[in-house]
Amino acid sequence: MGFDYAIVHVKYTIPPAVLLTLLYRPLFTKLDAFKVLFLVTVAVTATIPWDSYLIRTNIWSYPDHVVIGPTLLDIPLEEVFFFFIQTYNTTLLYLILSKPTFQPAYLRAGRPTASSPWKYQKLAGQLFLVGATVWAGLRVHENAKGTYTGLIVVWAAPIILLQWTLAYQFILGLPWTNTVLPIAIPTLYLWLVDTLALRRGTWVISPGTKYGVHLWDGLEIEEALFFFVTNTLIVFGQLAFDNALAVLYTFPALFPKPPSMPTPLDLINALWVSPYKYDRARLAGLQDAVLRLKRKSRSFYLASATFPGPLRSDLLLLYSFCRVADDLVDNAATAEEAKEWISKLHQYLDLVYSDAKSSTVSEDFVQAHFPSDARSALLQLPAHKLPRQPLQDLLHGFEMDLAFNTSSPIKTETDLRLYSERVAGTVAQMCIELIFRLYPSNMTSGEERKVVDAGNQMGMALQYVNIARDISVDAHIGRVYLPLDWLQESGLTYDEVLISPEGARMESLRMRLLEKAFSIYDGARGAIETLPVEARGPIRVAVESYMEIGRTLRQKGYTVRAGRATVSKWRRVIVAWRTLNKSIA
């Protein structure tokens, strides 16, 4: 009896588990818990018979003086715990590293007429894994130096073959931070741990079953292979799981009402869907939306990673529509062209919300009247989940922007509130509408209306922060969004601000606007607590990530630099993590 193996866990496997749990705790969802439980169960039950065979055939052994004593099918309990803790740690690391990635954007629809390399890559992987399995079987049959290596490969390769066959596109298509990194980090770490354990004799490989080759002093090649293969199994299992979820939640035509907690049968059905059946137009819309969000709003892109899958898709598509509509108007060469774009957008909404018109009519209108890079955003707008009025009001906000060509439309604080409500409050309102559509609550319609109205107010607060940050940027394009009566009270004229948007008086006005923003924010944030639990934390992140810009601007001595982010990426990440932690406290 001894505690050497138990001490390995105390020193090297449990501390990472605690750290990863604390890091991911604010983001942990019921679906994540299901993933972890599912993968741990599969990993432990699949490994126990294999490891038991190794021990009973003396390929692998644990000296009596290094283990406490209790066993399961001849496997020391410390080893059984290792199966659990390795899977848990690698799974959590994968969840952390993959969280920022909007994975459905990496699905690829098949084209019957295209000579895609995907099928050849799939076949190459299958042939390699089948060949490895055959080679491993021969090594086991020989019962010589390659026996342990053969047993590792003949056990793992068929499972990896199944994972590859079902999810090869996802495995090949996702960023390396979702695939290579979650395999490499725990593998390297366990190589170091194993080096220490083998040197101390915590576990022993029978000399006649190994090649005697070391990756480095203290790490035998078989052990290096074992940790690489097992971490690959875990991560590929996660990728197959997420591939299935992406299909379930991305294509409403294929899965009109996907369950929030899918069964294994749901996952298998999703993985068996041919890529030729994927909705290419919807995929293109999501891919375009992700690119726009990355370029235009880093704060919201960070916040979007915290939203559940189906809601995240709808929010991305909504943002994409709003962004494209805004760009069409802002980038117009003349005021007349901008008015034409607004008119066309009004016509598009008429078609979309008209009961008498088919979707084909609106699609034909978009194809005929909008540039190619704007079409997917319009056609993929989840209009069937949204009321028309907020979208109409958004266009009225663009019309207020055009009024700057003649005179400022923002003469009083009332005008400022109206403008902010139209261009930002409406967007926040639509976000809340989508949340209630996806996650029905027990509220009455009146109570839901109050929450939607509070969302509108919160959007106004965020727009105030945006205006406060961009005073100089806006002045350079000939616009001042501060009320004219505020300027008069400070002894300034509109033209003076256009020429010189800096100085003590302008800083005073910036602080005044921020005070208003935080006052509105304080009045509206209580409504967030009544949102469905699935969206409550993510909405907090979206709000706090932006309000952190306001807090930064209010810091004494802070200098605004036009065109530069006021909050660093890491500070936004910390704000998001703290916000989510508070939401579960």
UniProtKB/Swiss-Prot annotation:
Judging by the UniProt lineage, the source's domain of life is Eukaryota
Q: Pathway, per UniProt? A: Carotenoid biosynthesis; beta-carotene biosynthesis; Carotenoid biosynthesis; phytoene biosynthesis; all-trans-phytoene from geranylgeranyl diphosphate: step 1/1
Q: GO molecular function: any one?
A: 15-cis-phytoene synthase activity
**Residue numbers spanned by region Phytoene synthase:** 250-585
| Keywords linked to the UniProt accession | Carotenoid biosynthesis, Isomerase, Membrane, Multifunctional enzyme, Transferase, Transmembrane, Transmembrane helix
Q: What is its EC number?
A: 5.5.1.19, 2.5.1.32
One example of a Gene Ontology biological process annotation = carotenoid biosynthetic process
Question: Where does the record place it?
Answer: Membrane
Family matches, as PROSITE patterns: SQUALEN_PHYTOEN_SYN_2
* Entry's family note: In the N-terminal section; belongs to the lycopene beta-cyclase family. In the C-terminal section; belongs to the phytoene/squalene synthase family.
Q: What protein name is recorded for this chain? A: Bifunctional lycopene cyclase/phytoene synthase
To which species is this protein native?
Phaeosphaeria nodorum (strain SN15 / ATCC MYA-4574 / FGSC 10173)
